[in-house]
Amino acid sequence: MNSFNIDVITLLPKAFELIKNLGVITRALDKNLINVNLHDLREYGEGSYRQVDDKPYGGGAGMVLKPGPIFKAHESINKFPKSKTLLMTPQGKVLKQKDFVRWSTLDQIIIICGQYEGFDERVRCLADEEISIGDYVLSGGEIPALSIINGLTRLLPGTLGDPDSLVNESHNSPLLEHPQYTRPQIFRDMKVPDVLINGNHKEIELWREERMLKRTIKRRKDLIKNEFCDLPIDEYDGDDWLWDL
């Protein structure tokens, strides 16, 4: 089995040292399931000072990443047949679980991390997709890139100790995951639901399916409006036609 290749263009390669101690990613690295290659943007900087940024045309606050160093870094990367370049930007489409599933069928992803006030607009032509992890702004693209590496790696065969743990996770379906409990059975007067300890697997499965639907409607109606358009989802307040969570 060939390794999945992840190339990251960044001004802060040290930010990715964390992956050496993240269980799932560390396991994948040890098994050669993934290769993570960091490309320090500073090494492709221009002039004796290896400049990577400059003032924006038209004025404005902050500095903008120059196109030259990013293009050089991207061109230096060996491209695999099935490869996509992802540009980390708060202007991109919001990352979804289905994106990880799509990318897991590739040979390679190349991630470009922004910094400062962003990057020269011409950098966008390098990207197959522009990705955001939410409607907020961070100081750089490194944290979003780490999120992508983590979410993608755990889908690769051989990474997780128990592959079945992926099946019922939140966002693998339109529904959020059901509540989970472990020992002790009673903790500070909070008791595990009886149905989970009665040994009736059909009742347990029904209970879980009901909780998945109810939890999703109560917390993330936006995930299921298209799936359950015949139900009065917008009218649900947690106390009427569905049980409380």
UniProtKB/Swiss-Prot annotation:
Q: Which reaction does it catalyse?
A: guanosine(37) in tRNA + S-adenosyl-L-methionine = N(1)-methylguanosine(37) in tRNA + S-adenosyl-L-homocysteine + H(+)
In alphabetical order, the GO MF annotations are:
tRNA (guanine(37)-N1)-methyltransferase activity
Question: Native species of this protein?
Answer: Prochlorococcus marinus (strain MIT 9312)
State what protein this is by name.
tRNA (guanine-N(1)-)-methyltransferase
GO terms (BP aspect):
tRNA N1-guanine methylation
Amino-acid positions noted as binding S-adenosyl-L-methionine in the UniProt annotation, renumbered to this chain: G114, I133, G134, D135, Y136, V137, L138
Taken from the UniProt entry, a GO cellular component term is: cytosol
Q: What is its main location?
A: cytoplasm
Q: Among its keywords, does the record have Nucleus?
A: no
Q: Which family does it belong to?
A: Belongs to the RNA methyltransferase TrmD family.
Where it sits in the cell: the answer is: Cytoplasm
Q: Does the keyword Transcription apply?
A: no
